[in-house]
């Protein structure tokens, strides 16, 4: 008899979990509180309780070739950065083509997950659900939590003296949908993350004045990188990851800062992070420096206090006659249906082996999918997480001992996987695990047996090997070989640049030259000279 797996949430993580369970011969049942798939990307013009919320103008920050399901490329004519409506269309098509909808119970709330009395022997869970006023309990052999971490807003009102006397209105970015209500207003946005910068830039076209208050500032990157290609197609490569990991930190930090300042000098815009050499996760916004240059948007330090009509900043300056304050201050990490002790242990911190498995669990039958964040796309990360979890549930993979998992988790919490308070913001209370993208997905791929064997590829298929190592680390790489091999993976990798330029070549003038792997090879050969030059500069 197949093991039954309960899956919470039908966003991209939940859909990946359903498919991976089916591939491993498991029997999935997914519970989704809304009436459709998509999770975060299912837009609503009003905020819904218990659901993630996005604003009308949201586009992806990862390009289409980097954030697809690994055996399901986007249509050729899709833009490289996708509006939420187009992404939702893709997600629904994926669910339909993979025949996943019949495994989902829509408009069903999960109100509780608890261990069965026989858990120490069976590892089973009781999942309590509610639908149409009726409550039901179901026993599952394993559970995957795929409900995301952008649901419960962190609104740190206690951190801002005088806010209770402020006469204007304030709201969390979760409640922001469009700029119309702020036309002609003076608006303060607190928090410089992707949402905060997006909202501030959008408001700056209709509002009288917009100010962003940030505690530590941030690097700002454009989605458009070298030669006009998407940033992640150029940056997220195995070769680049190799250099970042082997270079001495003072050199890699210096190179990182130089690259971040190529577009504009952050210091001149008030955006230089407090620690200039810190490789802080960047903010993606193509218009922020332009709006600052136009004078419709300004950057200020932290708010010291509020008065009835103004905000006083740490540098003593004021923003007067404020109409609205928008807190883009992240989200609280919370799974209210689950006993919090299950995922917390030492120092009351989130403790998850590889960001997925609670290491102190007597039986490895609970997995959290989609909690880890990295400078890479969410969909392929969630897919690999769900695939590994499904293999563990199906007894195709085994986990290390509890002590080994705890030792690894403690090391990662102190180094690679850092427990951050709010994803990209300094105010939040969420405990999102962050890690280097390629290092992490390669690790998951190794557990599964799906990590591409680069030396073998160079011997057997040099053309493909060059693209895999020097080109973008696209999701198709993890379907080239191993248990989940997809026959279309090789062609998808070799044609990914064609799909990248297809939607932009609306007026063809000449043959487009895509980045050639040998260009990266030449860069690698010139690396010793670069290293020598930088070393001489510092010494």
UniProtKB/Swiss-Prot annotation:
Keyword line: Endoplasmic reticulum, FAD, Flavoprotein, Membrane, Microsome, Monooxygenase, NADP, Oxidoreductase, Transmembrane, Transmembrane helix
Binding positions for NADP(+) per the UniProt entry: 195-198
Record's bilayer topology term: Single-pass membrane protein
SUPFAM superfamilies: FAD/NAD(P)-binding domain
GO MF entries: flavin adenine dinucleotide binding; N,N-dimethylaniline monooxygenase activity; NADP binding
Residues spanning the signal sequence: none
Cellular component terms (Gene Ontology): endoplasmic reticulum membrane
Top-rank EC class of the record's enzyme: oxidoreductase
EC identifiers of the protein: 1.14.13.8
Transmembrane spans: 518-538
Superkingdom of this protein's organism: Eukaryota
Annotated positions binding FAD: 9-13, 32, 40-41, 61-62
Name of this protein: Putative dimethylaniline monooxygenase [N-oxide-forming] 6
Species of provenance: Homo sapiens (Human)
Lineage, top ranks: Eukaryota, Metazoa, Chordata, Craniata, Vertebrata
Gene (name only): FMO6P
């Amino acid at each position: 008899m197949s093991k039954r797996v309960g899956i919470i949430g039908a966003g991209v993580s939940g859909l990946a979990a359903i498919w991976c369970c089916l591939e491993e011969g498991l029997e999935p049942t997914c519970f989704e509180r809304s009436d459709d798939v998509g999770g975060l990307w299912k837009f609503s013009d009003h905020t819904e309780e218990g659901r993630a919320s996005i604003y009308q103008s949201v586009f992806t920050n990862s390009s289409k070739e980097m954030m697809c399901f690994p055996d399901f490329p986007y249509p050729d004519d899709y833009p490289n950065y996708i509006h939420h409506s187009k992404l939702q269309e893709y997600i629904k098509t994926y669910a339909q083509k993979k025949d996943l909808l019949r495994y989902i119970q829509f408009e069903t709330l999960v109100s509780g997950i608890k261990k069965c009395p026989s858990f120490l022997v069976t590892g089973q869970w009781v999942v309590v659900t509610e639908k149409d006023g009726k409550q039901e309990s179901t026993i599952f052999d394993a559970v995957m939590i795929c409900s995301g971490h952008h649901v419960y807003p962190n609104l740190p009102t206690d951190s801002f003296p005088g806010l209770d006397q402020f006469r204007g209105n304030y709201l969390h970015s979760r409640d922001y949908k469009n700029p119309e209500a702020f036309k002609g207003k003076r608006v303060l946005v607190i928090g410089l993350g992707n949402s905060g910068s997006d909202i501030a830039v959008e408001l700056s076209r209709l509002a009288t004045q917009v100010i962003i208050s940030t505690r530590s500032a941030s690097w700002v990157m454009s989605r458009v990188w070298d030669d006009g290609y998407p940033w992640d197609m150029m940056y997220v490569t195995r070769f680049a990851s190799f250099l970042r990991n082997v270079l001495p930190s003072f050199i890699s930090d210096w190179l990182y800062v130089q690259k971040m300042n190529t577009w504009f000098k952050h210091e001149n815009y008030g955006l230089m992070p407090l620690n200039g050499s810190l490789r802080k996760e960047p903010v993606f916004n193509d218009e922020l420096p332009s709006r600052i240059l136009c004078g419709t948007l300004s950057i200020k330090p932290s708010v010291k206090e509020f008065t009835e009509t103004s905000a006083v900043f740490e540098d003593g300056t004021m923003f007067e006659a404020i109409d609205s304050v928008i807190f883009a201050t992240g989200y609280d990490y919370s799974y209210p249906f689950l006993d919090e002790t299950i995922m917390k242990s030492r120092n009351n911190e989130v403790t998850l082996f590889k960001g997925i498995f609670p290491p102190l669990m007597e039986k490895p039958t609970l997995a959290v999918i989609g909690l880890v964040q990295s400078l890479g796309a969410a969909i392929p990360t969630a897919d690999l997480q769900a695939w590994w979890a499904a293999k563990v549930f199906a007894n195709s993979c085994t986990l290390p001992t509890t002590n080994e998992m705890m030792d690894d988790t403690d090391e990662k919490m102190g180094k690679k996987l850092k427990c951050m308070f709010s994803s990209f913001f300094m105010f939040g209370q969420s405990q999102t695990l962050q890690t280097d993208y390629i290092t992490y997905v390669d690790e998951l791929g190794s557990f599964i047996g799906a990590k591409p064997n680069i030396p073998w590829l160079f011997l057997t298929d040099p053309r493909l090997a060059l693209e895999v190592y020097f080109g973008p680390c696209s999701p198709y790489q993890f379907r080239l070989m191993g248990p989940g091999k997809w026959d279309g993976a090789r062609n998808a990798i070799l044609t990914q640049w064609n799909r990248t330029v297809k939607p932009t070549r609306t007026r063809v003038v000449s043959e487009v030259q895509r980045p050639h792997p040998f260009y990266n090879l030449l860069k690698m050969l010139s690396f010793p000279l670069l290293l020598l030059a930088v070393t001489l500069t510092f010494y």
